[in-house]
């Protein structure tokens, strides 16, 4: 996994702040593979419904970028209990829980 301990801590803290204490954050995509280089940070966040996704995403990014250097971060949000879409199934299958 190509994230530093400080980045992991920042992601988890920002997710708790924006999405709540029960949010589960997974890293997926190229950053999971230590042999690859570059790439954005792909995060899957599983949350308890209901959620104001727009507000929570904005709050998450603000909290995250106050803790780490801004960079390309893609966030996929899934409400717990909902049928995952194809892209979300990849995150569940290949992702690493932070």
Feature annotation, model-predicted:
Residues 1-26, 32-38, 48-98:
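Catalytic core of pol beta-like nucleotidyltransferases
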């Amino acid at each position: 996994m190509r994230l530093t301990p400080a980045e992991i801590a920042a992601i988890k803290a920002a997710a708790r702040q924006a999405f709540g204490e029960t949010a589960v954050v997974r890293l997926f995509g190229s950053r999971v593979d230590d042999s690859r280089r570059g790439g954005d940070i792909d995060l899957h966040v599983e949350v308890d419904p209901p959620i104001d996704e727009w507000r929570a995403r904005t709050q998450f990014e603000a909290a995250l970028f106050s803790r780490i250097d801004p960079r390309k971060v893609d966030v996929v949000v899934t409400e717990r209990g909902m049928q995952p879409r194809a892209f979300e199934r990849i995150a569940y299958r290949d992702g690493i829980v932070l």
